[in-house]
């Protein structure tokens, strides 16, 4: 049975003060505090801006090697793809996150494509080039477009030893259903919430404004155990970060798995 690690998508939210972090805790100490409770964290700041070596070194040091890191790929590799994405941006991104791999704390790079990334010949070629370019770093791929749910895609990911990211998100046209698929030795699940009304209409905070019930999380347990039987490690991350709901649900899932 694989090791199951639970955490949140991002940790540096000021609105979590007095909900998770002590009210007077400086933001520079958030990661150290987070690591006292959780054993994995998904870093998402790297999507919005290219990480720096010093940032990554500081995070490794502040973690005290108590958590396993997943770092989200920079948007220039997934959402704002150009002719320079592979030859220029990719090497820069790989170099910037070397402190994690040097300290053996980097478990995967999360490559999350937008809904506009369609299942086309050019997209398939790009996907393979990106995964190969990130090697030897482990890669896990999240699609937001249902077109990619194909056995041929799973086979390609297996061939490239890249993980498939399972998701829980609103039941809307073109989004992915809650399937449990393993294509590498890493199982991966992201809980985005089920806020149908705000998924397209709201901003990023409103989109992920959702608190899972215990019954909704319990329904995932068989899928988590299935992934654990097929992999060496399973990550479960909560992205419903508004008002620290991700913390509430991460704790809830931890308790359910420990029963």
Residues covered by each model-derived region:
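Residues lining hydrophobic/aromatic ligand-binding pockets adjacent to catalytic sites
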Residues: 1-259
